Amino acid sequence: MAENIDPSAPEGSAESAVQAAPVPIHTNPGQLSLLAWIESLGGGLAEGVELFNDEEKGHYIRASKDLPSGLSSGTVVARCPVAATMSYLNFYPTLEGLPKHSFKYNRQFLRGTEPDVASAFLLMDQYLKGDDSPWAPYIKSLPKAENLTTTQYYEDEDLEWLDGTGLESIRAARLKDWKEKFEEGKMLLKYAGNTAIESYTWELFLWAMTIFGTRAFTSRVLKEFAPKSTPDDKIFSVLVPLVDLSNHRPLTKVEWHITPDAVGLKVIDGVKPGEEIHNNYGPKNNEALMVGYGFCLPDSIVDYRMLTIRAPMESPLYDATKRQNRMFPHKAHRYESSDYYITNIFFPFGDESSTIEKTVFSQNLLDAMSVIGANERDVKVIELEEDRIYIPVTNFGRSRSFLSGLCCLQQQLSNHIANANKGDYLKKTPQNEKQRNAQIYRQTQSMLARNAVAVTIWLLERAKDANWEENKHKVLNRLLDQLPEDWYGLPVRDRMRSLLTERESCVKQRELYKNHEITMHLPEKTRECFNEFTGRIQTSLDEIVEELEVDLPCLELLVYSMFIRFCVDTYKYLGPEKSKTALGPRLTKWAPLILESYPDPSDHDLLPEDSDTDYLLTTIHEAIVEMRENDIDTFKPVEEYAGPWVDKHGWLSRRSLRWAWYVAEDELLRVSYPPYSLVAGYPPEAPSKPVRRRSQDESDHEDLYFYIPALNEAEG
């Protein structure tokens, strides 16, 4: 199979020869000069291949319309002599077969600059020499600064189109880095006695660096000419005239045709008459294309989006990374942005048998978000390997961290959607090519984020819905209804539908519960007893709740806290075997997990840190004590399960209730509500905060769900 041309991939080879073809009438004078120069050095275009120019694409190569059957597979369509290339090798005069030049430099300059920076200075120098440069025909054919569209050339109103995209900071960092390299290089050339340095302006250097960045190939294309790359074995970029006129198209099957004296481009698939001949830069995403090449593809199936994961100090991920560094000191562990990404739902390099999650999210992203979403119980089981930090989410009770990570990821992605919509640039009319590229970039970034948010909604709904198999198609239709029709045609919607409904998922059904849903796994008799008891408790507390202005989240936490106490005290009082009848198999397995993970208040007095919560729980406890004194019959049925009431150590004692509240907060997940609005591009305004600091305002757009892990199929 053919290998794509990619800086990180090996090149192919070919046996085909190139026959120089007559220049067609479409070639303009500038390109004719370039082509004539290449032909004079022994290169050129294959028969039936022509240079073409139009306003939209500029100069490119294509198969002639006059060809009866197009170009066959294996044709070497363009060939550039090594003598026409420009690269770091031109600083090594002992290498034969390269053009001679008069650029003034010394060894200190080469030692003090990176290969591509040195090459940019060479290109500047040759540009200033005009017709006296051996590369004059090529340099004349290169685009002028005003025609370059990389982000480095965005100014004034163009820059506004990058607002909130992340490209702003990338652009600023690159310009700062290049400016420093420019100043350092000029200083070294001054010491080398170069008298032309005053002519080496920042603007010209920016142009030269951009030319190398947008047109150059890897030094591997010269491996037959210089097998060791350079005398000091450096990797560098190479300008390959004529061949560099081929434009990028993802997944195009092409190979290098490399000989000791030339670099050629060979097509693997046939090319029809009049069809453009493309190159393949590798699976680059639109961010890389915008920054490195100055264009953007609206429908690239190989697109993906990098996410920045910042682990706050003392967070689980931060602490785990520190421990990993101590365990594996020989390897510097830094989480790079390339580790965290979301992919296009059509991404062709994934495993078709993979789960929904791993189709859209990178494994490192899933691992990191799970660790970030870890609670006190999850932190204890974080696994450290040389190249991985993760929580074994397949073990009983460990999927909570994964679900929590999905909630965090959903929040972050919804903010990305909002940023893409910022300034309403998706609806404005671009005034030039740079603005058109920026608009396409915003749209593709928004689509990637929307697709990923749709997946998180689907997975979290799966974890919440008791009748998932019955309701999942309703969820799917609601999701698809929120997607912009002008962006999401039938093929995209069909792909989303098949992805969500036909692939397996790591997320188990029904592990998240809201309010009284948590009792559904209690056997019917036990459930009726518990619900009747808690109903009377809540009725008695209505006046207190109204007086204290207790919000809905606190009432939900109270329900969860009483449920936790009931289950763990029933388990302790009745024992494992009898608990199976009283609690059911799922809660009988869950109760000891909670007791083991959170020390009982008889050993550690775990109190809520918030003074308002402390006051609320004290008031509630006092009301429960008073209620028991006045209506002891309400408590008797429950005591058959949870044991006799003992004021200091009973299942609703002051200390026990505080402990249960603490556990409830730690086991909760905060899920965005209404979730479907996130796909439409309307994220919550307030950022996510720890549960115990949740305000009344936040209840408008987040729901509290309690986590109870599912049993394996054999256990259930």
Where are these regions (language model features)?
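Long, positively charged leader/targeting segments at protein N-termini
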Residues: A2-P81, Y88-P93, P137-G716
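Eukaryotic helix-linker segments that join adjacent hydrophobic helices
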Residues: F91-I139
